Amino acid sequence: MSLSIDVTSLPSISSSIYKHESSSTTSTISGKSIGRSEQYISPDAEAFNKYMLSKSPEDIGPSDSASNDPLTSFSIRSNAVKTNADAGVSMDSSTQSRPSSDIGCDQVDFSLNRGIKIDAMVDSSISISTKSKKEKSKHETKNRKCYPKIEAESDSDDYVLDDSDSDDGKCKNCKYKKKYFALRLRMKQVAMQLIENL
């Protein structure tokens, strides 16, 4: 039996990642401000510090905080401004951290679009051939020796060896010759009895 597997193409994955600019909102940022359009309220640093230190941490609310995000709540005392909800929030606590003019400001226009293209094709074929096995079995059948069929009514004397059947007289004086003939006759009788019972 022969087994052949033909895989013409394995799965191929091709990915393309591309970037291009888009018309996202341009924001002016400085220091540690968040990435969206902000309106800054520039408080007096000393007045702000006095205001924040005069309040207990439990009394500080969203209007006093620089950020409502729990990840940045650690910066409430040092980097907060008082502003309303509609205006943007800033994490800058003093005017000194911001440049005095627009020259030093960073203009940010950023957008990332990612496209991934995946192509996968699997072509396979399996063929199983049993020709060699059949040819082998025919070859073995030809090599088998053909023995005479023993009929139930056949004469037992035809199947008893005599001295002429031996090779070069090797079995003429064999001490097991009598036992062999007796055993062969007994086996023949058992075979005949089995055939009759069937």
Curated annotation (Swiss-Prot):
**Modified-residue entries (Phosphoserine), positions:** 67, 154, 156, 164, 166
Q: Where is the composition biased (Polar residues)?
A: 91-100
What are the protein's GO molecular function terms?
ATP hydrolysis activity; magnesium ion binding; nucleotide binding; RNA binding
Main localisation? host cell
Alphabetical keyword list:
Glycoprotein, Host cytoplasm, Magnesium, Metal-binding, Nucleotide-binding, Phosphoprotein, RNA-binding
Gene Ontology cellular-component terms listed: host cell cytoplasm
Chain sites annotated for binding Mg(2+): 92
- Region (Disordered): which ranges? 16-37, 53-72, 85-104
Gene Ontology BP, a term? viral genome replication
Q: Which family does it belong to?
A: Belongs to the rotavirus NSP5 family.
HAMAP family named among the record's database cross-references:
ROTA_NSP5
Q: What does this protein do?
A: Plays an essential role in the viral genome replication. Participates, together with NSP2, in the formation of viral factories (viroplasms), which are large inclusions in the host cytoplasm where replication intermediates are assembled and viral RNA replication takes place. Orchestrates the recruitment of viroplasmic proteins such as capsid proteins to these factories. Participates in the selective exclusion of host proteins from stress granules (SG) and P bodies (PB). Also participates in the sequestration of these remodeled organelles in viral factories.
Q: How does it assemble?
A: Homodimer. Interacts with VP1. Interacts with VP2. Interacts with NSP2; this interaction leads to up-regulation of NSP5 hyperphosphorylation and formation of virus factories. Interacts with NSP6. Participates in the selective exclusion of host proteins from stress granules (SG) and P bodies (PB). Also participates in the sequestration of these remodeled organelles in viral factories.
**The protein's name:** Non-structural protein 5
* Source organism of this protein record: Rotavirus A (strain RVA/Human/Indonesia/69M/1980/G8P4[10])
